Amino acid sequence: MSEQPIRAVLWDFGGVILSSPFEAFNRYEASRGLPADLIRTVNATNPDSNAWALLERSDISPAEFDALFASESEALGHRVPGADVLALLSGDVRPQMVRALDTVIANGFLTACLTNNVVSTSEPENERQVQVRDIMARFHHVVESSKVGCRKPEPRFYEIACELLA
């Protein structure tokens, strides 16, 4: 089998272009005397059908997520409102990664951002949202779980990205 040249680079957004929400989760947990990584544990329990998965696919609203996540966390011994978790999702832009993205594009590679996300409910657009929108506009394609109805690590999510880049 002959090797094919690399034509495209797939990027994640949270934890790559933005700082990881896991850092904010840990600060929240510590400030409330909760076990470390509780939020991640809730998110990892029934990962294809839990509140987090449902929200990322836009199968439930943020209000429904609030109640369902609270119930799921309570089942693990500590009630955490889902609204609190949503407030922790906005990471900081990593300028060095934005420069890396610009370099990849300048070198002729196609790019796609693959992100598990939720529909934004904040109005009006704030400064951070403008910054994120401007970064997203750099990508040739953006695949958002909240818009395509599937999420990482589901194979269909990656298939959509490959179809867009073909």
Where are these regions (language model features)?
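Short, glycine/charged-enriched secondary-structure capping and boundary segments
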Residues: 23-26, 126-130, 157-159
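Adenine-nucleotide cofactor-binding loop residues
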Residues: 14, 148-149
